[in-house]
Amino acid sequence: VSQDNNIQLSVDKLLGSTCGVTLIKRGNYALEPTVRGLNAGQINTTIDGMQMFGACTDRMDPISSYVESNNLSSINLNLGPNDEQFGSSIGGGFNFKLIKPQLGAKKFVSGSLGAGYETNGNAYRGLAMVQLSKNKWAIQANSIYRKSNNYLSGKNREVLFSQYEKWNFGVSGIVQLFKNNTLSVDYLQDNGSNIGY
């Protein structure tokens, strides 16, 4: 994931363009990623190496829905059954690596703003990121808000209860304690409301 080029894309769109990954669409919100046809308990899904489990038993909100592209520095995909670093599973898995602030950046204050609109579902989104950076410490905050009405099917029929609204907020800080030692803290919150399936 390149932060500059893909910050406007959803995680679903980033995963959908990855070889070996297909997405299961059950509604307008949160497509479920599969690795070579395997999903759920057959694949490992982690955020910064931390094992995650979906809250919904029918997989309507997969782990990939808890992060946004502006939270991420990269998405690591393992296509095989071995992954010593984040745990093994029969189908491989994903590790969503959170973006970290940069110590000693060229500018003390930097950031970005973005907005997007999709005609189907009258969907819009807005995002922001700000970073403060010194040689010994840095902090970064990012947020995104997305809202969509019911979308239209291929035959131009309204799919009822396919609306959603969500916001996502992340903050990360890092302090250099010694020459080769740093302390970092991450916070990520994702809230969805009025989500129809």
Regions found by a protein language model. Name each.
Residues L113-Y117, L132, A141-K147, V185-Q189:
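Transmembrane beta-barrel strands of outer-membrane/channel proteins
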Residues D12-Q51:
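Extracytoplasmic beta-strand/coil segments of soluble accessory domains associated
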Residues L160-S162, N180-Y197:
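Flexible loop and strand-edge segments within Gram-negative outer membrane beta-barrel domains
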Residues T22-L23, Q51-P81:
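Short acidic/polar hinge/loop motifs at secondary-structure boundaries
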Residues L31, I90-G92, V109-G111, Y124-A128, ...:
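Hydrophobic, lipid-facing positions within transmembrane beta-strands of outer-membrane proteins
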